[in-house]
């Protein structure tokens, strides 16, 4: 039996977790050299309170705290949407529970943010953290969603940090942790070209010969040149606006395509796992397994053919009934 100051792990063995007088469990962690995989973790201390108290930090203070602890250069709460900071926090609290080599510290796109949050979810599951991560909300980069989550994570950090030294730059092996772009900024900031240098009137002015000293242009010709230069400048602005809009559409379509491809690969992996399970239990002659295999391997044509006999059976059943009525 464990001593009065120790607890049992979920599997029942003595894991040397220490219980303070107030009942708080301090997880036991084995001091090991970084890079080893023989870590011994206790359960993480779960935090459920999300109410605002005097200890709740302002958005400026909490960003300063994040930058100080894990050596980042974030300027806004919204930049936490990449998930990279949380991954490094988990490595700090529970060394080895997450592989920082897989974390995208220079993430700039939404699917890269989702990748980081999946790593965070895996570390939460490994450490028995009950918190549900609202990934879909966080990756959008909205202020309130990210503020609520970092406020909770600060309390989770305070409940689990044991005061050990930690070098965040060395832990991520010198990876440049570039802050993600501000979600409010425009993605495409094309340099504005000088209208005077690129306008047709500028080229015409250069190619036109010098006016003779004795000649004076008439008023109608000067009015025509003024109107043509004004229309040319307006057309340049319209073209630049169209280019910016088209670039934004192309970028949004690329993001949508990447998201669809990622979702396709995700569900294909699930189907592959189901297929392997069915193959493992296929020799048991289970009707459910056989039915699942038929569904997995059925093509569109086969599914259409399976529906046709049912229709024919219904028509055959209706004919005897009609004959009996007569």
Curated annotation (Swiss-Prot):
Entries under Gene3D superfamilies matching the protein: 1.20.5.1430, Calponin-like domain
Biological classification of the source: Eukaryota, Metazoa, Chordata, Craniata, Vertebrata
Region described as DCTN1-binding: 186-326
Calponin-homology (CH) domain location: 56-158
Region span, Disordered: 170-239, 297-326
Organism: Rattus norvegicus
SUPFAM superfamilies: Calponin-homology domain, CH-domain, EB1 dimerisation domain-like
Family: Belongs to the MAPRE family.
Biological process terms in GO annotation: cell division; positive regulation of ARF protein signal transduction; positive regulation of focal adhesion disassembly; positive regulation of keratinocyte migration; protein localization to microtubule; regulation of microtubule polymerization or depolymerization; spindle assembly
Name the UniProt record assigns to this protein: Microtubule-associated protein RP/EB family member 2
Entry keyword set: Cell cycle, Cell division, Cytoplasm, Cytoskeleton, Microtubule, Mitosis, Phosphoprotein, Ubl conjugation
Modification Phosphotyrosine occurs at: 166
Stretch list, region APC-binding: 258-301
């Amino acid at each position: 039996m464990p001593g009065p100051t120790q607890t049992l792990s979920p599997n029942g063995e003595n894991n040397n977790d220490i219980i303070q007088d107030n009942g708080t469990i301090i997880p036991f962690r084995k001091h090991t050299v970084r890079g080893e995989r023989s870590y011994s973790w206790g359960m993480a201390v779960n935090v459920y309170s999300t109410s605002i108290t005097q200890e709740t930090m302002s958005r400026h203070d909490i960003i300063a705290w994040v930058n100080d602890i894990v050596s980042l250069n974030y300027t806004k709460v919204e930049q936490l949407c990449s998930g990279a900071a949380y991954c490094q926090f988990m490595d700090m609290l529970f060394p080895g529970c997450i592989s920082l080599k897989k974390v995208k510290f220079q993430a700039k796109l939404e699917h890269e943010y989702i990748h980081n949050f999946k790593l965070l979810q895996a570390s939460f599951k490994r450490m028995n953290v009950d918190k549900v991560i609202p990934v879909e909300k966080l990756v959008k980069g909205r202020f309130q969603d990210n503020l609520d989550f970092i406020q909770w994570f600060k309390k989770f950090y305070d409940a689990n940090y044991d005061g050990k030294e930690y070098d965040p730059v060395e832990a991520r092996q010198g990876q440049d942790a570039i802050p993600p772009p501000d979600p409010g900024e425009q993605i495409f900031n094309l340099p504005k070209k000088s209208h005077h240098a690129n306008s047709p009137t500028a080229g015409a002015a250069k190619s036109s010969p010098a006016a003779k000293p004795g000649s004076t242009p008439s008023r109608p010709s000067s009015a025509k040149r003024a109107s043509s230069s004004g229309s040319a400048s307006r057309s340049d602005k319209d073209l630049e606006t169209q280019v910016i809009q088209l670039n934004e559409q192309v970028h949004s379509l690329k993001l949508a395509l990447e998201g669809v491809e990622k979702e396709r690969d995700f569900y294909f992996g699930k189907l592959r796992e189901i297929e392997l399970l069915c193959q493992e239990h296929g020799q048991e002659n289970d009707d459910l397994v056989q039915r699942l295999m038929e569904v997995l391997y059925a093509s569109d044509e086969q599914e259409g053919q399976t529906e046709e006999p049912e229709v024919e059976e219904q028509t055959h059943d209706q004919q005897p009934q009609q004959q009996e009525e007569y």
